Regions:
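Short, functionally important secondary-structure microenvironments
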Residues: 1-289
Length: 289
């Protein structure tokens, strides 16, 4: 273990072409302190050699190419915006690292496949092509062709810009426009989903088979045939429950028709109220657990 740590520390310094400080600590993921020039690597037993090479190469890429203004821009934009900034900047620094050191290409590609197999991006069972553009861009640049990502002509223009971004100023410009594009994209997808929901609702397409009683946490109606007769008073009512004034009152309280939020496609639910890169967020969370 010690020999491996020493060799990886030496590798990091050689790649960075400067005497950066390299520390192994009980942290969950690798990180680079842009201001203090300190690379922190985790003490992990379940990572593969390729994963370690990826983490080292990735953070050294930030050491070489990411300016201190990155931190300021991320803070100013907020947490959701910072996921966009991270996706675009990651694509730039990893491309530049692989150009500098072609030997990193293979282990980085293998490592991202291994992370995907462990579902670090949170895409298992998801239709990746139904996700927001920012997430498709993230998967495209990190996983390559195996992700099977599709783009239309307008989206492809953003992909090409990310591919060619050479400076952090270009990254900021692309990120700001991409963020605005995805906000509009999410609004449009939600509107389309809502219109489809209303159409299905009018056609009576929602039934027990689609949603059932699970919406309400189970069937609240009781099988009175199985109850003890002593549980009822002389009028045949259950003292423990309030009487329903009518059958309509019962029906109105327990409709099986879902709300739009319940019927919303999973690919939209994951974004919540604010557009963000859920794949970047999931990856960071997975590294920290």
């Amino acid at each position: 273990m010690l020999n491996t740590q020493i060799s990886k520390s030496t590798l990091a310094k050689l790649l960075a072409t400067e005497n950066i400080s390299v520390e192994y600590r009980k942290v969950q993921t690798a990180s680079f302190d842009i201001v203090n020039r300190r690379l922190t690597l985790p003490i992990m037993n379940d990572t593969t050699p390729e994963m370690t090479d990826l983490l080292v190469g990735h953070e050294v890429g930030h050491a070489l190419d990411t300016p201190q203004s990155y931190v300021e821009s991320a803070k100013a934009g907020g947490s959701a915006f910072s996921t966009f900034l991270n996706v675009v900047e990651d694509a730039r620094v990893e491309r530049r690292m692989k150009d500098r050191y072609p030997g990193l290409r293979k282990p980085m590609a293998i490592a991202y496949r291994q992370f995907t197999e462990r579902d670090f991006f949170g895409i298992k069972g998801q239709d990746v092509n139904a996700m927001m553009l920012i997430d498709r861009i993230n998967l495209h640049f990190k996983l390559g062709a195996i992700a099977g990502i599709k783009f239309n002509a307008e989206e492809m223009s953003y992909v090409n810009e990310v591919e060619k971004a050479d400076s952090f100023e270009q990254v900021k410009d692309i990120t700001e426009r991409l963020y605005a594009f995805c906000k509009a994209e999410l609004d449009q997808k939600r509107q389309e989903a809502k219109e489809e929901f209303e159409k299905r609702k009018e056609n009576g397409e929602f039934d027990d088979e689609d949603f059932g009683d699970d919406i309400f946490g189970g069937d609240d109606t009781e099988d009175y045939e199985d109850k003890n007769p002593n549980d009822y008073d002389s009028n045949g009512s259950d003292d423990g429950d309030e009487d329903f004034e009518s059958e309509d009152q019962f029906d109105n309280g327990y409709s099986n028709t879902p709300t739009f939020e319940q019927a919303m496609p999973n690919e939209l639910k994951v974004y919540g109220d604010e557009v963000k890169s859920v794949t970047d967020e999931k990856f960071q969370q997975a590294l920290n657990t």
